[in-house]
């Protein structure tokens, strides 16, 4: 629903009061005087559309409901064993009888088991052992099984380490729900050298550029900023998540639940130390922002001072924790669905099926019935049917 200007101003005032924010504080954050804001709220002054959007955007930063959430977004662990059944049953605590087995793998592994987007690779090579890989969807699906097992990520990671698991990659994703970060602004600060970090390397890509060949969802990602070398064991990826939701799902940008995403990508020893820190303090915010603060900070230029003494940028200071609600590790359990298959059918197959149905109806033919009768289900299809029709509680080991 599109609000008119009067409704926007009424909503602005109501939210400001509900958040406990004074006119002066919001005015300063928005770059105007308190008197000017007072005239806007009382209807004596008509703001520009741009100013009204700025006021709403700045007010969103003061939302007492956590403006930031954090999730695991990628987990890759190698186990020094060839006993894949042990890893599935005792570490993942999943029922192997419901897993799809296929005689091929990635990363030079020769076979794998899968349950939705949860992949476990193995081979006859003892040095390679067993490899668990959970990408974004895999993490969300695994959380639904952790929930059924009454376990947490902390419990699982502890079990993995105790069993000798070697952390190969861990990604922590910080979701910005209110637009605290401004990616083009951060990119401009990198260009102007208002960016202090262990690595000066950065890359900024506009939406739609031929970019990010390593990214699975590269065609969906909006404007994207990489901080640090992509070859290093620590780097950051910041991108417009609302654009991704718009391209993937058609969600209007103004209705997107997540505006930006800040991903901390850790490999090998860096991933291990992050997990160790998580399991020592059980404080995901401390772990995440200690890594960020160690590697990067954005500042505002002060010509009369040394660069290391430049003032921390206000927006960046807010993001890393100044005067905002604390951040906790959250979960977003999602069941394994046929979303990608259904999207493919809808895009590639449905128009042809609809055409055949209309031809059958008009000519009295039975093309559709014949096609369905002749279709043969493979063992893979049968296992997917089994996975899709079994409740989560039956897919886990008790």
Where are these regions (language model features)?
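Positions in alpha-helical segments
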Residues: 10, 14, 35-38
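Residues in the recognition helix of alpha-helical DNA-binding motifs
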Residues: 15, 29, 40, 341, ...
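Structured, helix-rich domain cores that form ligand/interaction pockets
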Residues: 2-7, 14, 18, 57-336, ...
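Short alpha-helical DNA-recognition segment
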Residues: 20-38
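Short, basic-rich loop-to-helix N-cap that marks the start of a DNA-contacting helix
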Residues: 43-57
């Amino acid at each position: 629903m599109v609000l008119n200007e009067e409704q926007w101003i009424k909503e602005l005032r109501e939210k400001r009061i509900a958040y406990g924010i004074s006119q002066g504080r919001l005015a300063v954050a928005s770059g105007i005087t308190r008197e000017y804001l007072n005239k806007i709220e009382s209807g004596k002054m008509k703001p520009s559309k741009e100013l009204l959007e700025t006021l709403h955007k700045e007010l969103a930063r003061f939302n007492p409901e956590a403006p930031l959430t954090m999730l695991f977004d990628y987990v890759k662990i190698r186990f020094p064993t060839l006993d894949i059944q042990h890893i599935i049953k005792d570490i993942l605590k999943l029922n192997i009888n419901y897993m799809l087995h296929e005689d091929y793998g990635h990363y030079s592994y020769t076979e794998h088991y899968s349950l939705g987007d949860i992949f476990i690779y193995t081979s006859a090579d003892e040095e390679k052992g067993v490899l668990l890989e959970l990408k974004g969807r895999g993490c969300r699906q695994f959380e639904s099984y952790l929930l059924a097992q009454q376990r947490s990520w902390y419990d699982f990671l502890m079990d993995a380490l105790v069993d000798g698991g070697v952390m190969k990659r861990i990604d922590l994703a910080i979701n910005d729900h209110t637009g605290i970060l401004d990616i083009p602004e951060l990119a401009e600060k990198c260009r102007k050298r208002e960016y202090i970090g262990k690595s000066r390397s950065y890359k900024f890509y506009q939406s739609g550029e031929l970019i990010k060949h390593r990214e699975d969802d590269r065609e969906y990602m909006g404007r994207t900023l990489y901080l640090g070398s992509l070859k290093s064991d620590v780097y950051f990826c910041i991108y417009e998540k609302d654009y991704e939701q718009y391209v993937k799902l058609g969600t209007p940008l103004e209705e997107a639940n997540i505006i930006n995403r800040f991903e901390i990508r850790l490999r090998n020893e860096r991933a291990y130390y992050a997990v160790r820190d998580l399991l020592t303090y059980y404080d995901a915010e401390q772990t995440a922002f200690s890594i960020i603060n160690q590697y990067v900070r954005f500042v505002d230029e002060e010509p009369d001072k040394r660069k290391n003494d430049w003032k921390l940028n206000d927006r960046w200071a807010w993001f890393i924790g100044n005067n905002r609600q604390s951040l906790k590790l959250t979960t977003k359990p999602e069941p394994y669905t046929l979303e990608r298959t259904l999207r493919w059918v809808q895009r590639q197959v449905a128009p042809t099926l609809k055409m055949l149905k209309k031809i059958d109806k008009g000519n009295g033919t039975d093309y559709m019935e014949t096609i369905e009768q002749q279709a043969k289900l493979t063992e893979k299809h049968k296992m997917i049917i089994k996975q899709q029709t079994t409740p989560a509680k039956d897919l886990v080991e008790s």
